[in-house]
């Protein structure tokens, strides 16, 4: 059963593309028709592509790896932040930090700087500096948080990127491609679907379309995380069961050895004749 359907996508306005004069010819396979100078996306193909992307991302989440969401356009940032925050995945909804992926070591230094400032505020260091210095450090920390967002929790490169509007986020797409990081994206009629690994043909401007598709994707990831948790619990139970069985077997074996030893002593004692008393 599909994770979404034609009617839901239609109601969300996912079928509306861009003006014909702004189209990217590579999107031709996903265009159903043209109406009033606007390309109409074939939602039957969108349903298929949503399922493909959702299933792949579910498996990535199940493996325990991180998926980075990128959506800095006004109508997408709040929607994506809310939905992605709920599943504990990192996201960038402000400006994309250049070199975020290709120069990840430098980004990590900025993250460590944030951590250092946080430590200063709790270990009493702030009490020994002037108000001016304190204000400067606080502003620096706020700027870092705005630029880095939730990626402060990202200790290593993400296993995949999910992007809203690859034309706007072309730098993120290019960095991911350079590092062979799989890319998933909502791709409108003005963009090249071949620029990403999993393209979902749909309106990437309407908030309703973005919310619907992002919601389906985050739900699939949530399923993957839940299955991972169940698998880990099952493995722990099996491991504990194996240990218990081994301990019981060792106890039985030890008990059998003791019994065998006692039986041997008893038999040896029974075979001896009592010593004859000699009268002097």
What is the predicted function of each stretch?
Residues 2-233:
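Ribosome large-subunit tunnel/peptidyl-transferase-proximal elements
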